[in-house]
Amino acid sequence: MKNEHTLYKLTDINCRTHGGMLWEVGKTNYATGKGTKLCTADVLHAYTDPLLAVLFNPLHAGFENPRIFRITGDIVAMDNMKVGSKWQRVEYETDLPKPTIEVRITFAILCGLEVYQDSNWRMWAWNWLDGSNRAADAAAYAAYAAADVKLISIADMAFMLVADGI
């Protein structure tokens, strides 16, 4: 098939996903919806990399003892975290990556650096990443400074919007 990709599927310990769909080696599952919108019954969710599946498990699936399968499927929808398919075929179970807490923190900080521009927070982030300052008080100060700046900006915006009658 032309639109066929290697993907990765997380399941619970019993090889089921939310809604009770069973995932078995050699079996193809199909989405029941007609559209292509993520986070709906229109598509089956998967990841392009097993490490992303594990890192996003707490946010997306929340499986306590997940299993991961290499699957083949089409891609009809995607965001920066996952993809959506109309069909997915289970190839085989594979080893679940086990990122350390340091890998998880590093990933979170790198994601933050992609979008957050507060200079105090960015300085703390780079110091944490290069190992020069991983003290808890430095992290707390950076979080406080970043939150304070954002809250002030939000408060100013709220004041302006109300003053303008919006």
Question: Language-model features: where?
Answer:
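Short, glycine-biased loop/turn motifs at secondary-structure junctions and
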Residues: 1-166
